[in-house]
Amino acid sequence: QIDYDEVGYASWYGADLGGELTANGERFRPQAMSAAHRTLPLPSYVEVSRLDTGRTILVRINDRGPADPDRLIDLSTGAAEALGIAQSGMAQVRVRRVNPVEAEKIALRAGQAAPLRPDMPEGLLEILRERVARLAV
């Protein structure tokens, strides 16, 4: 069941927070494929897609945030690196809640990456870029 599909801005956090407790009560692992979101249930699984490249990753929501009200999601360091935004610090993204297969859930709970997702097609990226352009930043 997909009940959340939004566009906005992603940033990343946590390089210095290793071992701290997340809102889910788990120890934060900066290199894990995890993220913080304000409202999605803990845990939730989302595909995060960059709107400039189409690159898509699967992450597990296990924390609350981002602190910045203009951000939709805060990625762990590992997720930011996988999405290719660790250097720039921020990117326009689509965040879509998904229900992955059990093997992917197990991998993410263990701090490992799930198999790569296909890149988003250019036609869909154009539509989503128009949606995010209407957001006030």
Map each language-model feature to its residues.
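Secreted/periplasmic proteins
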Residues: 1-137
